[in-house]
Design a protein with these regions (language model features):
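N-terminal charged segments
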Residues: 1-36, 42-45, 94-111
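Conserved acetyl-CoA pyrophosphate-binding loop and the N-cap/start of the following alpha-helix
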Residues: 146-158
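Acyl-donor-binding surface of acyltransferase catalytic domains
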Residues: 18-83, 155-159, 168-197
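A conserved beta-strand-loop-helix scaffold within acyl/acetyltransferase catalytic domains
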Residues: 97-143, 189
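A short, internal acetyl-CoA/4′-phosphopantetheine-binding micro-motif in the GNAT/acyltransferase core
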Residues: 16-22, 140-148
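A short, well-structured alpha-helix characteristic of acyl/acetyltransferase catalytic modules
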Residues: 81-91
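Amphipathic alpha-helical "stalk" segments
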Residues: 13-14, 74, 92, 128-129
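C-terminal active-site rim and adjoining tail of enzyme catalytic domains
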Residues: 164
Length: 197
């Protein structure tokens, strides 16, 4: 079990189950369960409705072996400045008033890369890649103006260029899951995110 005794930033869970047999009362112990609290059940195995939580979404863990990378017409450009990160975050959020969840200190982390994916000079999308123990995490992928297929391909190609020996992992749902599967990922199993209303 991972948990934070203090409320986490927006979009980050207050607790994460690390074992399928976690018990809801154990998950809730030691966290602020007031409205806004969120829990990521990594196995979609628990039901928190009797504790005042509602399901926010169900997604699937995705995984891709480090095999042939897809061709992409997009150029991957590493975001390296605070101003560049603010512009990336605004595009990720879909416009103005983006929450400040990507801090400039992130750019100094050696195992984290924030990428702007460009068609010429135009931003087509972006992704965050983070290297962990034997795997590269892929998160916060977004596409601008219906470029999903090209953005997924570019994200996979960029990860393979940087860390060619490592597989990719993440989680997605809805149309994003379909794009991931079309790009060579496989769905491993469900996860569920709960929110206290």
């Amino acid at each position: 079990m991972w948990r934070s005794a203090r409320r986490t930033p927006l979009y980050y869970p207050d607790a994460v189950t690390l074992l399928a047999d976690a018990v809801p009362s154990d998950v809730l112990a030691g966290i602020d369960t007031s409205p806004g609290c969120s829990i990521k059940d990594s196995f979609a195995a628990q039901d928190f409705t009797s504790h005042g939580f509602a399901e926010l979404f169900t997604a699937h863990w995705i995984y891709r072996l480090p095999e042939a990378r897809p061709a992409s017409g997009l150029r991957a450009e590493e975001v390296g400045t605070a101003a560049g990160l603010r512009a990336w975050q605004s595009a990720w959020h879909g416009g103005d008033d983006a929450p400040d969840v990507f801090r400039p200190a992130l750019l100094d982390e050696p195992d984290v890369v924030v990428l702007a994916l460009r068609s010429g000079e135009e931003l087509a999308g972006g992704v965050v890649l983070n290297r962990g123990s034997g795997v590269v995490g892929l998160s916060n992928l977004f596409a601008v103006d219906g470029e999903e297929t090209a953005v997924w391909s570019a994200a996979v190609a960029a990860a393979a260029a940087r860390w060619p020996e490592l597989p990719l992992a993440g989680y997605e749902h809805g149309d994003d899951l379909e794009h991931a599967l079309a790009c060579g990922f496989v769905a491993l199993g469900p996860l569920r995110v709960w929110m206290r209303r």
